[in-house]
Design a protein with these regions (language model features):
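Catalytic cores and adjacent flexible loops of soluble metabolic enzymes
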Residues: 1-188
Length: 188
């Protein structure tokens, strides 16, 4: 079974997200290119527009729908990654997505936007031995609460073994004065 603590070198993740723009062929090509670049994993975003965006925001729904892949397409992508010996994982934007992703991935990433969504974190912790939590925009108190939620929900998981915290600066590109790299030490 995969464990972050068993890694002997840097674990490089290709953040594909929604850069495939809803096109399975583009997503497959991005996995191929990531493999050729020597990464260890590919990461996507998984969502269903109707669970993620209010029905009162039809324009926004229509835009987001163009970037959405079906569950069947995610299964194809997961198999392609595994065939290439790459870890496949995704960021779910709804609890239903977590249930689906459990079937195709043994790692899950919680977005910094969901750092304070403790119900989502609890649900993810129940079904995964490997959680990655992004901390962008989170306060130290919020990060502590998220970590404690994971430990309480799944006492067998440990930081830097099954739980990985990612230092994230939620500004793109990030101004150098806002990088706060010293925070990485605190996260450890």
């Amino acid at each position: 079974m995969f464990k972050f603590s068993n890694l002997k070198k840097i674990f490089i993740v290709a953040e594909i997200g929604v850069n495939h723009e809803g096109d399975l062929n583009v997503a497959m090509d991005l996995i191929k290119k990531a493999d050729e670049a020597g990464v260890n994993a590919v990461k996507f975003q998984t969502y269903k527009v109707e669970k993620y965006i209010s029905s009162t925001q039809q324009d926004r729904r229509n835009r987001a729908k163009r970037f959405q892949l079906s569950r069947e397409q995610f299964e194809v992508l997961s198999k392609e990654a595994k065939k290439r010996k790459l870890k496949f994982f995704s960021t779910p934007l709804h609890m239903d997505d977590i249930g689906f992703l459990r079937k195709i991935s043994d790692i899950i990433k919680i977005s910094s936007g969901d750092l304070t969504n403790l119900e989502l974190i609890k649900y993810a912790a129940r079904g995964y031995q490997n959680l990655v939590i992004s901390t962008g925009l989170g306060t130290q108190k919020e990060i502590r609460e998220a970590v404690n939620t994971v430990f309480k929900e799944k006492p067998t998981i440990r930081k830097n073994e099954g739980l990985v915290l990612m230092h994230c600066v939620s500004a793109y590109p990030a101004p150098e004065k806002e990088l706060n790299l010293a925070n990485i030490k605190w996260l450890q």
